[in-house]
Amino acid sequence: MQVILKEDVVNLGYKDDIVTVKDGYGRNFLIPQGKAVIASESAKKVLAENLRQRAHKIAQIKKEAEEKAASMQGISLTIKAKTSSTGTIFGSVTNIQIAEELAKKGVEVDRKIIVLKPAVKEVGNYTAVVRLHKEVTVEIPFEVVSENETIIEAKPEGAPVPVAEEPAAEAEQAEVAAE
């Protein structure tokens, strides 16, 4: 089923896009919620006419997104998180925390347009993608640091583990030496 989106739908498309969705998703969710209409021939003609009339407005929105992207270039964030002794974060860093840190830097961004892949669950350097417009995205580098002072490096797999001798074995060795 083809539908015309009336608003941006995350992981599907942007306003005025014609997308193909499963019948149930279109009929039971998108259309009743007012997020889409069925893409009939007449609806496509109306959409084309509306896009021609709004071409100037769409160009202005894209220009504003590009200006905001230019202002976000060069921004890097540092996020403090509670961690275990091995550097694993309790919980994870989310797009909400990225939006809050950007707000502290003076850049207001809706958390829904920030994409983090893969999930951030350890201390280190990562990149968040901010989708300001369907054609304008910005990559924001950020570092996750520990609120704790010291972090012990996790032992690599296969590293030998020192084994303490048992006291009984030491006693047997002492008896053998005494004889």
From Swiss-Prot:
GO MF annotations in UniProt: rRNA binding; structural constituent of ribosome
Superkingdom as given in the UniProt entry: Bacteria
GO cellular component, one term: ribonucleoprotein complex
Disordered, as annotated region: 156-179
Record's compositionally biased regions (Low complexity): 157-166
InterPro entries, A to Z: Ribosomal_bL9 (IPR000244), Ribosomal_bL9/RNase_H1_N (IPR009027), Ribosomal_bL9_bac/chp (IPR020594), Ribosomal_bL9_C (IPR020069), Ribosomal_bL9_C_sf (IPR036791), Ribosomal_bL9_N (IPR020070), Ribosomal_bL9_N_sf (IPR036935)
Keyword list, A-Z: Ribonucleoprotein, Ribosomal protein, RNA-binding, rRNA-binding
Annotated Acidic residues bias: 167-179
GO-annotated biological processes: translation
Family label: Belongs to the bacterial ribosomal protein bL9 family.
Protein purpose: Binds to the 23S rRNA.
Protein name, as recorded: Large ribosomal subunit protein bL9
Species per Swiss-Prot/TrEMBL record: Porphyromonas gingivalis (strain ATCC 33277 / DSM 20709 / CIP 103683 / JCM 12257 / NCTC 11834 / 2561)
